């Protein structure tokens, strides 16, 4: 058999196998692709030709289309909507340059998508340097089927009256701007079952206070805000059902929170918060992660973490142990303590700072509850940190396991190896309050050898 004939047979066989797939499976596969590629598959065969019209997702990015196309980007999107036949539109994603797309067209497309019982809407307005923002008005905020809404980049949220989004559960506001504070309030108040809110803000501030209120169903809140200008005060949050709080960056001075049902809080950076009661807002949590400076955070008098069972703290900040001592003294039921040194090429030995002082009384959590102690990337050269580790081992009566990890060391660095072996032996030799405590030492492979200290 000639090579060409063999190839033709293999192609035909391959084509036959594809044809045997049920339409439902083909549509499922196509739903993971951008619409431009999905439409292109219609040339494969007669079976594929109508399938793209039934794919429940539409995704357009203006960068995928150039000026050499037969039709403009807006015309292509319009034609796609006119040809599309899926009874339910699961998602509509549109990435565009605001100055190249008529806002009227966007409103038309969103309106058509809403009429198809749209469940997820993603609008990404690329910033090309012109500063022209796409205005997201109240007229685009009436949809009873929408479950997820993401607004990204150069979009102006201008909402003069409460929206109607009875099914919206997830809302992401990523680097968008706001006409005024009432636009935020009108957006949130019209989402009666909203469960997840993500707010990302940049350096430009257009409002003084970001208020999250009238959202009794909110369960998850994420804030990432690196704006530190004087004109922006901060956040006022009233979320009676909030369970999870994540703050990735927060440089504003003000922060007020009412979240009596909060179960977990991860605070990665709140270095500019000056509210003396910041930690007091978190006393209901069971799991807490803190990466804060003890110099800038005041522990609120009388605040007790009665529910806290798991605490993770980062140890980069100067005198971080002062905050640790306070947390141990005020967390009587703590069961898990994790300390993490997130320094890579940053050495703490030369930092100023005071000595660590033992608590006047052994904290109740050490006497009765602490079971797991983990110290990731333990600093072998800092006496204060060895003292803290020794103190916990000596006083944690119910400790089951103590794990110390360190970043790897080159075999040529004999001095470091000797020092770590010495400290390892010292810690392993500590007379522990718990006879059943297992001592574990291991290397943390997530750090590169070149970054070891």
UniProtKB/Swiss-Prot annotation:
Limits of the F-box domain: 15-68
Q: Does the keyword Chloroplast apply?
A: no
Q: Which SUPFAM superfamilies match?
A: F-box domain, RNI-like
Task: Reply yes or no: does the keyword Repeat apply.
Answer: yes
Q: Which UniProt keywords apply?
A: Leucine-rich repeat, Repeat
Q: Which InterPro entries would you find in this protein's record?
A: F-box-like_dom_sf, F-box_AtFBL13-like, F-box_dom, FBD, FBL13/AtMIF1-like, LRR_dom_sf, LRR_FXL15/At3g58940/PEG3-like
Concerning Pfam families, the annotation shows: F-box, FBD, LRR_At5g56370
| SMART domains the record matches | FBD
LRR repeat feature ranges? 89-111, 165-190, 215-239, 247-270, 282-307, 331-358
Start and end of every FBD domain? Answer: 355-406
Protein name per its UniProtKB record: F-box/FBD/LRR-repeat protein At4g00160
């Amino acid at each position: 058999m000639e090579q060409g004939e063999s190839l033709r047979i293999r192609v035909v066989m391959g084509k036959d196998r594809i044809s045997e797939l049920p339409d439902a499976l083909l549509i499922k596969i196509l739903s993971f692709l951008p619409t431009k590629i999905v439409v292109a598959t219609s040339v494969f065969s007669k079976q594929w030709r109508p399938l793209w019209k039934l794919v429940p997702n539409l995704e357009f990015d203006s960068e995928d289309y150039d000026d050499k196309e037969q039709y403009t980007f807006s015309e292509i999107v319009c034609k796609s909507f006119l040809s599309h036949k899926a009874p339910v539109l699961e998602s509509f994603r549109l990435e565009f340059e605001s100055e190249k797309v008529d806002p009227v067209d966007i409103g038309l497309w969103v309106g058509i998508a809403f009429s198809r019982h749209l469940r997820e809407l993603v609008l990404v307005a690329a910033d090309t340097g012109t500063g022209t923002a796409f205005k997201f008005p109240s007229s685009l905020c009436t949809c009873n089927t929408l479950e997820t809404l993401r607004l990204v980049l150069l979009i102006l949220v201008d909402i003069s009256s409460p929206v109607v989004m009875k099914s919206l559960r997830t809302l992401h506001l990523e680097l968008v701007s706001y006409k005024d504070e009432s636009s935020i309030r009108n957006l949130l108040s019209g989402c009666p079952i909203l469960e997840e809110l993500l707010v990302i803000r940049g350096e430009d501030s257009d409002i003084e206070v970001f208020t999250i209120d009238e959202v009794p169903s909110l369960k998850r809140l994420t804030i990432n805000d690196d704006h530190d200008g004087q004109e922006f005060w901060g956040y006022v949050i009233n979320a009676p059902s909030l369970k999870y709080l994540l703050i990735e960056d927060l440089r504003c001075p003000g922060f007020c929170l009412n979240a009596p049902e909060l179960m977990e809080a991860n605070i990665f950076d709140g270095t500019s918060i000056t509210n003396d009661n910041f930690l007091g807002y978190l006393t209901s949590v069971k799991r807490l992660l803190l990466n804060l400076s003890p110099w800038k955070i005041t522990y609120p008098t009388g605040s007790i973490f009665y529910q806290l069972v798991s605490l993770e703290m980062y140890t980069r900040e100067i005198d971080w142990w002062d905050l640790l001592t306070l947390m141990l003294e005020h967390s009587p039921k703590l069961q898990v303590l994790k300390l993490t040194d997130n320094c890579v090429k940053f050495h703490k030995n030369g930092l100023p700072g005071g000595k660590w002082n033992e608590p006047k009384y052994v904290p109740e959590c050490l006497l009765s509850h602490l079971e797991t102690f983990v110290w990731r990337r333990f600093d072998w050269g800092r006496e204060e940190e060895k003292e803290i580790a020794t103190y916990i081992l000596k006083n944690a009566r119910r400790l089951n396991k103590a794990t110390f990890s360190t970043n790897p060391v080159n075999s040529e660095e004999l001095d470091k190896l000797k020092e770590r072996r010495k400290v390892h032996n010292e810690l392993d030799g500590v007379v522990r309050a718990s006879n059943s405590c297992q001592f574990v030492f291991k290397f943390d492979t997530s750090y590169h050898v070149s970054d070891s200290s």
